């Protein structure tokens, strides 16, 4: 998945398979292997993607929450306020709690539930965690185009919109709007892993 080549013109590089490495820079392997020291660096586009509707109107996804709220406001002022409130309520939680949990041994369900039940926000998260992405979006937003826009990102990643237990995932994808792209092409990730291994005495044969 980390293959880069000049598929059309010399010097114009194409990522043949993977382009966006959503979880690589946030994961522990990137830090523990110090991949940045081995040439693996990520660029963060301010505009991630867009959804184009049959009437040629569109919604563009921005990395900055303020710009994303302004984009949503073109369709629904209420939905823009909801989005802004979600960022205020859960943005920090995602960074300080949810992301570390993704890369840690799972807690016992009873322990996780007891921790979340201690706050109103946590109890709401438990409810959303059990729901489907469609149910969550229907609860939060009024504008169908806004719902479709956020749902499209989930389906592209391979998550079913009507699958129970993935409502929290929808919230994560709404609030964690990033699309890190490997500088110099996705193959730099493979090359960086090779260099990291060689720095510890390994011999890589291809």
Predicted regions and their residues:
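Short, conserved clusters of charged catalytic residues that mark active-site
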Residues: 24, 132, 188
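A short glycine/serine-rich beta->alpha loop
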Residues: 8-13, 157-158, 177-180
């Amino acid at each position: 998945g980390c293959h880069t080549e000049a598929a059309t013109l010399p010097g114009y590089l194409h990522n043949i398979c993977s382009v966006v490495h959503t979880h690589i820079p946030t994961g522990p392997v990137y830090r523990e292997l110090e991949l940045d020291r081995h040439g693996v660096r990520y660029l963060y586009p301010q505009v991630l993607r867009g959804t184009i509707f049959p009437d040629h109107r569109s919604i563009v996804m921005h990395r900055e929450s303020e710009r994303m709220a302004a984009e949503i406001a073109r369709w629904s002022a209420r939905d823009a306020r909801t989005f802004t409130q979600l960022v205020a309520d859960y943005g920090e939680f995602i960074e300080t709690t949810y992301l570390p949990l993704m890369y840690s041994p799972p807690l016992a369900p009873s322990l996780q539930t007891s921790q979340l039940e201690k706050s109103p926000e946590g109890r709401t998260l438990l409810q959303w965690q059990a729901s489907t992405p469609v149910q969550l979006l229907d609860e939060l937003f009024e504008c169908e185009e806004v719902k479709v826009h956020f749902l499209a990102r989930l389906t592209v990643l391979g998550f079913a919109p009507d699958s129970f237990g993935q409502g929290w995932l929808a919230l994560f994808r709404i609030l964690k709007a990033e699309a890190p792209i490997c500088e110099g092409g996705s193959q730099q990730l493979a090359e960086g892993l090779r260099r990291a291994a060689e720095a510890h005495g390994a011999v890589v044969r291809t």
